[in-house]
């Protein structure tokens, strides 16, 4: 059965239910990742040559990804589960409602003048230091997270579901989790996490650019395209650059700029064009992601119906 037919159902489940209230499968996967890391990691960083560290990391991600991807493929082929399994797995892979809820808490806190709460809660969704951010800094950090995670947590999962079905959604979500845990450029993970980071970059290459296209089509298209073309190449990430530059331009706000990470000030290129964002722009960013998500669902469903009619 065409995967596109399941996509609106899974998105409705996410909209109605959000993440599982008690236990998400990714929590268990994260524990497994830590166990595999303990077994696969050498005695200390730098104890082995670079190639061997990278090989260890590559073997670890293959060990973690292959069984779950194959299990999803097998379960989705069972006659009694061919609808339930794909819908359930895509529902678990997409985090649209969770992203919107986190952003809404920050938006509401800023709207009510509670800067301390806004700083605390934006710290849940970004890695930068948030304790000294002003209102504009909190709004900027939140919008950047919404735009980037809109690609990572929503559109990329939808893309791989449409391309490879349930196994694609599982493969992508688990690979993205591995990148979040191992894809750091520090002493411990620079080489061991190299394969996880590169694999995630590869999986996100096309989805990121389709996400950027979605943002500019649903916002200020000319501004979004200009920012994408001129600013994305300056950003530190080849996939986040197009997404955030196009999104900032589509919203007509200024993002990027310097930020403090783990006590160290990091200069970042500017993104977007327009005024400094406010709490109202957080809501606009969330709506941009949501409209894009349902646009993908509508286009996918229309394509599935058209293909079905042609082959009828």
From Swiss-Prot:
GO terms for molecular function: ABC-type vitamin B12 transporter activity; threonine-phosphate decarboxylase activity. Pfam families: CobD_Cbib. The keyword Zinc-finger does not apply. One of its GO terms (biological process) is cobalamin biosynthetic process. Pathway: Cofactor biosynthesis; adenosylcobalamin biosynthesis. Its main location: membrane. The chain crosses the membrane at residues 61-81, 83-103, 152-172, 292-312. The keyword Magnesium does not apply. It is found in: Cell membrane. It comes from the Bacteria. It is a multi-pass membrane protein. InterPro entries: Cobalamin_biosynth_CobD/CbiB. Keywords: Cell membrane, Cobalamin biosynthesis, Membrane, Transmembrane, Transmembrane helix. GO terms for cellular component: plasma membrane. Disulfide bonds: none annotated. Converts cobyric acid to cobinamide by the addition of aminopropanol on the F carboxylic group. HAMAP family: CobD_CbiB. Belongs to the CobD/CbiB family. This is Cobalamin biosynthesis protein CobD. It comes from Chromobacterium violaceum (strain ATCC 12472 / DSM 30191 / JCM 1249 / CCUG 213 / NBRC 12614 / NCIMB 9131 / NCTC 9757 / MK). The lineage of its organism: Bacteria, Pseudomonadati, Pseudomonadota, Betaproteobacteria, Neisseriales.
């Amino acid at each position: 059965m065409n995967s596109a037919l399941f996509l609106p159902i899974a998105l409705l489940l996410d909209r109605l239910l959000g993440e599982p209230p008690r236990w998400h499968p990714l929590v268990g996967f994260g524990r497994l990742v830590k166990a595999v890391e303990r077994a696969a990691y050498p005695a200390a960083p730098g104890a082995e040559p670079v190639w061997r560290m990278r090989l260890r990391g590559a073997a670890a991600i293959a060990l973690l990804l292959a069984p779950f991807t194959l299990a999803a493929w097998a379960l989705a082929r069972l006659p009694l589960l061919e609808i339930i399994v794909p819908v359930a797995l895509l529902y678990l892979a997409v985090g649209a409602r969770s992203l919107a809820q986190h952003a809404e808490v920050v938006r509401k806190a800023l709207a009510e003048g509670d800067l301390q709460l806004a700083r605390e809660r934006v710290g849940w969704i970004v890695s930068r230091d948030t304790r000294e951010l002003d209102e504009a800094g909190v709004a900027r950090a939140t919008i950047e997270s919404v735009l980037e995670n809109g690609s990572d947590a929503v559109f990329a999962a939808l893309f791989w579901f449409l391309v490879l079905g349930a196994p694609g959604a599982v493969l992508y979500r688990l690979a993205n989790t591995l990148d979040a845990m191992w894809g750091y450029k520090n002493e411990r993970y620079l080489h061991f996490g190299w394969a996880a980071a590169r694999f995630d970059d590869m999986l996100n290459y096309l989805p990121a650019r389709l996400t950027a296209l979605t943002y500019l089509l649903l916002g200020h298209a000319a501004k979004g395209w200009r920012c994408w073309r001129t600013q994305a190449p300056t950003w530190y990430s080849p996939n986040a650059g197009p997404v955030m530059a196009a999104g900032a331009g589509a919203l007509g706000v200024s993002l990027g700029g310097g930020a403090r990470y783990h006590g160290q000030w990091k200069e970042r290129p500017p993104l977007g064009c327009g005024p400094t964002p406010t709490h109202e722009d957080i809501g606009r960013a969330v709506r941009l992601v949501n409209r894009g998500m349902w646009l993908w669902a509508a286009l996918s469903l229309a394509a599935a119906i058209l293909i079905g009619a042609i082959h009828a």
